[in-house]
Curated annotation (Swiss-Prot):
Substrate binds at T49, C50, N51, R52, S105, E110, P111, Q112, Q116. It is an enzyme of class 1 (oxidoreductase). It comes from Shewanella sp. (strain MR-7). This is Glutamyl-tRNA reductase. The lineage of its organism: Bacteria, Pseudomonadati, Pseudomonadota, Gammaproteobacteria, Alteromonadales. PROSITE patterns: GLUTR. Transmembrane segments: none annotated. Pathway: Porphyrin-containing compound metabolism; protoporphyrin-IX biosynthesis; 5-aminolevulinate from L-glutamyl-tRNA(Glu): step 1/2. NCBIfam families: hemA (TIGR01035). Coiled coil: none annotated. The record marks H95 as: Important for activity. The gene is hemA. During catalysis, the active site Cys acts as a nucleophile attacking the alpha-carbonyl group of tRNA-bound glutamate with the formation of a thioester intermediate between enzyme and glutamate, and the concomitant release of tRNA(Glu). The thioester intermediate is finally reduced by direct hydride transfer from NADPH, to form the product GSA. Homodimer. The active site is at C50 (nucleophile).
Length: 416
């Protein structure tokens, strides 16, 4: 068993590269099946969010997995390789546990990543790329993330990218009581944004979504107005703040649409926060006067303040993930020991069966019983002690006293 984790995130790559290696929801099922086919166990999970893309595989070759990622997205090795990180064995286990616990997030301790990891695991199960080891790994990871939440203060005053976006809006507008907000998307992140906006007394909210029913369902809770994406041009001129987070592969707001809206607003300033990957708002919008565009990469100052306040809780959480990752590896080793014992017994039984059959044939042909039994005993002894004798000889010749001692203990040579 060899667990491998390979990824790219907000710490190692720009939003431009991150959006190139992201997997869209409608393609991730087939992507997981394709990735799993490159492993010896057929086990693989892809975690793809706006801030990270990570591949978790059991019994996969690191170079082969990286090659698959580059081929899948049509990217050059020299562009991707410097931004990748990789973990093996216990380090891979700990990394996943840290990710799910929010310890590796853009905003330390944010809870949304756990839901995203769970969703990735569900999709992998649907794709048939989960077996014993990966299943146990992710189930344990979810338990560890819960343990971190309940036993530390990492989740106190819970924050997220959504919280950071609203904090930035408050910083720029000082008060949100007179501002009108257009939210694009109706997923978990936008729902959190709406919650924070409501808590801060925003004047009004409009939610635009591809599926009107989903937007309407969300709007009931926040007393907001639901519209379709096609209606955005009609509502954009009224928006002081635009916050967007969808899974659209193409930008939803273009420079021309925003420019037209600003003219209708008589050039009153508009704050646009794009927290989607790939981006929902064309980067050229930032060139417009009175349009202030920010992406997830612009939220670092808020994030750094958050990290400082949660440092102590994070240290406690790190200890939990460290301990639990070792416990998981103990379970993995127990599986390996069971396999080894099974193989050893099977091998010994095969030798016995072979030699017994040979002895019975000789007896059937009239061989002397005593001579046949002595030959059977000698042959069985020689076959069974051959491998241990070779191992003892090599360890002794190399002066490897540690291995020699372990072999003597295993063979019962040091018993009184």
């Amino acid at each position: 068993m060899s667990l491998v984790a390979i990824g790219i995130n907000h710490k190692t790559a720009t939003v431009d590269l991150r959006e190139k290696v992201a997997f869209s929801p409608d393609k991730i099922h087939d992507a997981m099946k394709s990735l799993a086919s490159r492993t010896r166990s057929g086990e693989a999970v892809i975690v793809s969010t706006c801030n990270r893309t990570e591949l978790y595989c059991n019994n996969g070759d690191e170079a082969d997995i990286i090659e698959w990622l580059e081929e899948y997205h049509g990217l050059d090795h020299q562009d991707v390789a410097p931004c990748l990180y990789n973990y093996h064995g216990q380090a891979a286990v700990k990394h996943l546990m840290r990710v799910a616990s929010g310890l590796d997030s853009l905003i330390l301790g944010e809870p949304q990543i756990l839901g995203q990891v769970k969703q990735a695991f569900v999709k992998a199960k649907e794709a048939g790329t989960v077996a014993l080891t990966i299943d146990r790994l992710f189930q344990n990871t979810f338990s560890v993330a819960k343990k971190v939440r309940t036993e530390t203060e990492i989740g106190a005053a819970a924050v997220s990218v959504a919280f950071a976006a609203v904090s930035m809006a408050k910083h720029i507008f000082s008060s949100l009581s007179t501002t009108k907000v257009l939210l694009i998307g109706a997923g978990e992140t936008i729902e959190l944004v709406a919650k924070h906006l409501k808590d801060n007394g925003v004047a009004s909210m409009v939610v635009a979504n591809r599926t009107l029913e989903r937007a309407q369902s969300m709007c009931e809770e926040f007393n907001a107005t639901a519209i379709t994406l096609a209606q955005i041009p009609d509502f954009l001129p009224k928006a002081d703040i635009v916050i967007s987070s969808t899974a659209s592969p193409l930008p939803i707001l273009g420079k021309g649409m925003v420019e037209k809206a600003l003219k209708q607003r008589r050039h009153q300033p508009m704050l646009l926060v794009d927290i989607a990957v790939p981006r929902d708002i064309e980067p050229e919008v930032a060139d417009l006067d009175d349009a202030f565009l920010y992406t997830v990469d612009d939220l670092h100052s808020i994030i750094e303040q958050n990290k400082a306040s949660r440092k102590e809780a994070a240290e406690q959480a790190e200890l939990i993930t460290e301990e639990q990752s070792y416990l998981f590896m103990d379970w993995v080793r127990s599986l390996e020991s069971v396999d080894s014992i099974r193989e050893y017994r099977s091998q010994s039984m095969a030798i016995k069966d072979e030699l017994v059959e040979r002895a019975l044939n000789k007896l059937a042909q009239g061989g002397d019983t005593e001579q046949v039994l002595i030959e059977l005993a000698n042959r069985l002894t020689n076959r069974l002690i051959h491998a241990p004798t070779q191992a003892l000889t090599v360890a002794s010749r190399q002066g490897d006293l540690n291995t020699l001692g372990q072999l003597r203990t295993a063979l019962g040579l040091d018993k009184n």
